[in-house]
Amino acid sequence: MSDTVFIGMDLGTSRTSITTSTGVRTTVWSYVGYAQDHVSRKHLGGRDKVFGEEAVENRMAVNLVRPLDKGLILDDEESRQAVRDLLEHIFDEASIPSGSTIYGVIGAPAEASVDSKALILSTASEFMDSIIVCSEPFAVAYGLDFLSDTLVVDIGAGTVDLCRVHGTMPKPEDQRTHHYAGDAIDARLAELLTKNHPEAQFSNNMVREIKENYACVGTHMDPVKVTFPVKGKPTEFDITAELSEACFGMVPPTVEALQDLIATFDPEFQQKMRNHVLLGGGGSQITGLSRAIEDALVEYGGGKVRQVEEPQYAGSNGA
C-alpha cells in the first residue's frame, strides 16, 4: 500500500516553498537555467539544467527562465516547461517517497482568474494525485490559526495579496490584489538610481540584492552605501533616499486596499479587523513597514499591524 503525503506549496514569483507531512520544508528560487551549448553543459558539470540560486549565479552561461509573473504561470510553452522542471526539482528536494499518493494545496494570488488557477492545476497535476488552489493570504491565516476578524497581507515579488478572514473560506469580495510588490520596488529603485546616479553601472540582480539586504521604510533608517562600477572603477554611492522612496511606494496602495476591506465589512466588526492586520510573505521583512502602515492607518481610525514568524514558510505551512 502506498504512503499518503500531504503537501502545501507557495508557488511564488521569486521563491517556491514546500512543506510536507513527512516533516520536510524547503525553498528554491523560482528560476530555471538551461545549458546554452556543450561548453555550458560542461561548465554545469554535465547537467542540462540548473535551478534556483545556482541558475541565477550561472546566468551568463544558461538560458535563464523565470516562469512566473505576478504570482502566475506565464502562458507560453517555455514557462510551462520551466514550471514542470521546477516542480520536479522541488519534489526531489522534498524527498517524497516514490509511489506515494500526494495530496496538495497550492497558494495563488488572491484575485487570480479562473484561467490562471486552471493553468496551475493542469501543470501541477503531473506531480500530485489531488490538488486544491487556495488564496495565498488565506493559507497564511489558516496555518497560524487566525480564522476570524483578521486582515492578512501577503507581500510577494509579483503581487501584494490581501484577504479578510472571518471564520469562513474567503469569497471574492473578501480579497484584494495590487502589484506594487517586490519586483515593483526593484524597478522603482533602478529608475531612481539611473536618474540620480547616471554614471553608475548595475544589473537587475544587484538591485534585487540591495533591496533584500537593506530594504527599509522610514526617515530614521541607517545610511545605505553600496559600491557600483563607474567605467570599470568601483565607486561608493549613498542610496539611502532612493531605497526608502522605492520601498515606501508599497504603503499607499496597501493601506488603500486595507481600508477598502475594512469599510465594506460589517460595521460592528470593523474595529476588531483594523486592530488585527497580519503581514506575511518575503516583503513583510522590510524594516519599518509595519510601523509605516500603522502610521498611514491613523487617518482612517488607526490599526495594529504585526509580522508573522517564518514569513518564508507561512504560506506553505498553511496550505
Give each language-model segment a name:
Residues 161:
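Positively charged, low-complexity, intrinsically disordered RNA-binding extensions
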Residues 158:
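Short glycine-rich anion-binding loops that position phosphate/pyrophosphate groups of nucleotides
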Residues 1-42, 49-155, 165-277, 284-314:
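Nucleotide/phosphate-binding catalytic cleft detector across ATP-hydrolyzing
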